Amino acid sequence: SLRLMLRDPLAFVWRYALGWRAVPEDDQPLTLDARSYGELVHELLKRTVDALEPVPGYARASREEIEAALATSTETVRTHWPLKRSAPPALLWKHTLAAAAQLALKALTLDETFQPGTRSWTELAFSQAGDGAMAHDLPWRPDSLVTIPGTQVRIRGNIDRLDLTGDRRGVRVSDYKTGVEPRRAEEIVLGRGAELQRVIYSVAASQLLP
């Protein structure tokens, strides 16, 4: 840091006074890998649901309202994603984003309508140390501990989406997946561990909601 201050005072101010960092420049991909694509879809889902809450409310929103919120979220992600992450060239990025938006719309309109007064939250954390200050307007504190029933083993995570009825008697947890839909998906209970995540989500909801 002293060497930088002597050689380039302006760069020293940028880095240590303003906290600026250069964005890593990766090779521009032609496509997003599976993980990045999943994160892209999750980002669209989160922004859309958050935009609909608390008014009119995701669970009460019409398809037109969902589509409008998704369109706004898609445009925001279109401009912000390439500033922080690697993205394909412009034309391919446009098609990638359109495909991700279609997948997000399917996920957002798949579930049946819940009761009036239902609230929805996305990326809802549990057992996350140090997140207690972020508990405003959430159904529980993000640092609230969750354990496997009958043990002292703690589990933590983030619920993709939680819908809670106004009387707090009805709860729905959603775990978004962007991979290929398995055969006879309606018959899968634990799916050799692949569905275990939803079980953990349910345990968290049952312990943290009074």
Each predicted region: which residue ranges?
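Glycine- and acidic
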Residues: 1, 19-31, 52-61, 81-94, ...
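Short, intrinsically disordered, charge-balanced linker/junction segments flanking boundaries
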Residues: 1, 207-210
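C-terminal, charged and often intrinsically disordered regions of DNA end-processing helicases
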Residues: 1-47
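Active-site-adjacent bridging/hinge elements
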Residues: 9-22, 74-80, 169-180
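Hydrophobic (often cysteine-bearing) scaffold residues that line and stabilize catalytic clefts
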Residues: 10, 33, 37, 41, ...
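A non-catalytic, helix-rich entry segment at domain boundaries
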Residues: 43-137
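Non-catalytic protein-protein interaction segments used by genome-maintenance enzymes to assemble
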Residues: 124-208
